[in-house]
């Protein structure tokens, strides 16, 4: 509200970045790939495993929910999804536990799913919640996050003028790998961060949700005549 007519919010997918209304080449594009704290803490969105809510996880108006994937995917496909998008190395154990649970009753809430995963994997005192990788995988799949990112990066570069910069904040290695390759392989860019910048210990202590953040930047260069 404090920026007046200097700021316009447009609700679109990353892959629709090329449809942005601009009066000329952009000076910079910032991608923040994280789920906002407001989304995580809002039970009705179904992103988090710490508060109960419907197993939804849609960021927009997509048709498929996390509950649809959990209850309708064949067990083997669910295991592959958890391994690929959540990097869950015990994905088959989790998928088998979900398969048994959904035979008894449809899994409709975040609390139900978190409980099933915790029962299958156990919990380490002081360790991260055992369901975090499962929830990550489902959120990525529901919103097609990796496809959106891979599609949108080259489109964003095309909007930049010479000297314009594209900056990306990613939060897990799957995202970071896509960004690293996109920057490296695009001959319109000069990479500014040979290695990603990461939060200091002080920042991690102040904002634990930033602990896995990685910052990469690249600059649009003049194209050859």
PLM features: what roles do these ranges have?
Residues 1-225:
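S-adenosyl-L-methionine-dependent methyltransferase catalytic core, i.e., the SAM/SAH-binding region
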């Amino acid at each position: 509200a404090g920026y007046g007519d200097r700021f316009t919010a447009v609700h679109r997918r990353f892959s629709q970045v090329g449809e942005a209304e601009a009066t000329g080449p952009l000076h910079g594009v910032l991608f923040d790939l994280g789920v906002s704290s407001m989304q995580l803490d809002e039970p009705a969105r179904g992103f988090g495993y710490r508060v109960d809510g419907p197993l939804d996880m849609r960021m927009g108006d997509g048709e498929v929910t996390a509950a649809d994937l959990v209850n309708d995917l064949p067990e083997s496909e669910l295991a592959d999804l958890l391994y690929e998008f959540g990097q869950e190395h015990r994905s088959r154990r989790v998928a088998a536990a979900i398969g048994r649970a959904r035979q008894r009753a449809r899994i409709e809430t975040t609390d139900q799913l978190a409980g099933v995963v915790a029962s299958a994997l156990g919990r380490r005192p002081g360790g991260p919640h055992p369901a975090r990788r499962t929830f990550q995988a489902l959120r990525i799949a529901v919103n097609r996050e990796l496809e959106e990112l891979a599609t949108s990066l080259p489109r964003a570069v095309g909007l930049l003028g010479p000297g314009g910069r594209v900056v990306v904040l990613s939060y897990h290695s799957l995202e970071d790998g896509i960004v690293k390759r996109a920057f490296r392989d695009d001959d319109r860019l000069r990479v500014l961060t040979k290695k990603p910048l990461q939060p200091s210990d002080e920042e991690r202590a102040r904002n634990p949700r930033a602990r896995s953040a990685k910052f990469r930047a690249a600059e649009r260069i003049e194209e050859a005549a």
